[in-house]
Amino acid sequence: MSAKPIYKRVLLKASGEALMGSQGFGIDVAVADRIASDIAEARAMGVEVGVVVGGGNIFRGVAVASKGGDRVTGDHMGMLATVINALALATSLRKLDIDTVVLSAIAMPEICESFSQRATLYHLSLGRVVIFAGGTGNPFFTTDSAAALRAAEMGAEAIFKGTQVDGIYSADPKKDPSATRFDRLTHSEILEKGLAVMDVAAVALARENAIPIVVFSIHEKGGFTEILTGGGRATIVTDN
């Protein structure tokens, strides 16, 4: 297999759950360091990388609504959780001497820069890893939707969705041993089959902008970079 990457610019989506590792809450620094190592390898290959991180390891906005609270406030709390995760991942990357910037959809200038497409493209042009925090900056949108949105804005050639398993299955393979794994799908098939890999808005936005989605296990060290060169194990979602 050639070590030459088949993608030049990608968006990596890492869930808060992934950063939690085997812990019940918070950030496992060893996991953050491992993900950072994979990103560093991608940068060494010349791939430009943007990252969207979730916040579910710290807080989920829907939890507030399920207890009778205000969903908007809950989502704002969830957005703040993504900022914490973004700063943690940025710290892990900087330990590897990877130039990294955090851009937040919610203005907090004392902590990180504010998001704009112009800032994103500028930092990418300088070879920096760009971590997007704060989701879309609006309630009622998931970080999957933020990933699709940022991928479109940065001109990403693919969205790499790091999950708990090595691709898209017909059902949760951890609960259903008979679940079937898909090697390739279209965006439309995901929507038609109701496959729970990303929310409907995210998949629709990726389809509209013809952005492939690559679903892989974020827990396999080196898996991200292996897939970047055309190998590895993943489900590839395209528009045809």
From Swiss-Prot:
Its EC number is 2.7.4.22. InterPro entries: AceGlu_kinase-like_sf, Asp/Glu/Uridylate_kinase, Uridylate_kinase, Uridylate_kinase_bac. Residues 21-26 are annotated as: Involved in allosteric activation by GTP. It catalyses: UMP + ATP = UDP + ADP. SUPFAM superfamilies: Carbamate kinase-like. It comes from Rhizobium meliloti (strain 1021). PANTHER family: URIDYLATE KINASE, URIDYLATE KINASE PUMPKIN, CHLOROPLASTIC. Catalyzes the reversible phosphorylation of UMP to UDP. Coiled coil: none annotated. Keywords: Allosteric enzyme, ATP-binding, Cytoplasm, Kinase, Nucleotide-binding, Pyrimidine biosynthesis, Transferase. HAMAP family: PyrH_B. It is found in: Cytoplasm. GO terms for cellular component: cytosol. Allosterically activated by GTP. Inhibited by UTP. The keyword Cell inner membrane does not apply. This is Uridylate kinase. Belongs to the UMP kinase family. The gene is pyrH. GO terms for molecular function: ATP binding; UMP kinase activity. It comes from the Bacteria. GO terms for biological process: 'de novo' CTP biosynthetic process; UDP biosynthetic process. Homohexamer. Pathway: Pyrimidine metabolism; CTP biosynthesis via de novo pathway; UDP from UMP (UMPK route): step 1/1.
